[in-house]
Amino acid sequence: MRRMHTGSVPTPQDTQAHFLDALYQLYLPHKDEVEGIAMAVPGFVNTRTGYLTNGGALLYNTDTPLGQLLAEKCGCCVLLENDGKAAAMAELQAGALQGCSNAAVFLIGTGVGGGIIANGQLVRGVHFTAGEYSFVNTNAAGWDDERNNMACQCSTTALLEWYRARKGLPADAPMDGRRFFEAANAGEPEALDVLERFCHAVAVQIYNLTVLLDVEKVAIGGGISKQPLLLETLRRVYDGLFASRGDSPYMKGLPRCEIVPCAFSSEANQVGALYAYLQAFHS
């Protein structure tokens, strides 16, 4: 795979028409050398038709045939993939999950994205919504409270909210992952306590995947995944879940998965969307 050109433009936040225009302006200088367009987008994406039943962070794409509209505008083949699933595809084809039969990707950010690999294939689901971890409930007794969803328990957003509360800071106090891990790496007790709680929340969901899908590996992505302390703590807490039930005869033979960092970072969506395009049009 050879990268010829790179660049970025701001994503329009107002209308789909402006979004399509921005994409067309990117396409136009290369139209004579482009066979097709592979693109990762947020939301629930029908990869076969390019129809979005939910636009995610770009709500103007909800209930629209975005793939068809872009194909008509540019006059070429278009393949749309959900951004989390594209990242999982990149890891499966050329990253941390190469050779895996069953595996998963957790992308920890504003919410929790990613994808699931089963029998060596990306799982999209009947309605193309498989792997939408943000909506997974973590507390059946608290079903009516959305704060019990993984988006509010296993995301960077949650980590920073808990840290502000632990420090007695206002909810809108400036805070980011870099500042948090500076404190945690310096051994600050409050930061380490919050990190332990956070890793327990994530580890329980990895445990659930282990039981449900018998995954070999779970690859962790997102900005904070670059922090060695996160992976170190997460692995220790995950192993501790098994150790805490070590005397149960019913746990005997239950395998543990390997927790690894994603190989790709910001380019994962592009790489994964390209592989999805090649599968759709060249396999």
Q: Could you describe each region identified by the protein language model?
A:
Residues M1-G36, N46-T49, L70-C76, Q93-C100, ...:
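ATP-binding/phosphotransfer module of carbohydrate and carboxylate kinases, centering on a glycine-rich
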Residues R2-R3, L52, L122-V123:
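Hydrophobic "anchor" residues
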Residues V9-P12, Y60, G125, T129-E132:
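A short acidic/small-residue loop/turn micro-motif
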Residues V41, R48, A118-N119:
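A cytosolic small-molecule/anion-sensing beta-strand core signal
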Residues G50-T62:
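A charged helix-plus-loop insertion that forms the helical arch/lid used to bind
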Residues G67, V78-A103:
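Conserved phosphate-binding catalytic cores of ATP/NTP-utilizing and phosphoryl-transfer enzymes
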Residues D83, G109, A273:
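Active-site glycine-centered loops adjacent to acidic/histidine catalytic or metal-binding residues
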Residues Q98-Q153:
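Glycine-rich phosphate-binding loop of actin/hexokinase-like ATP-binding domains
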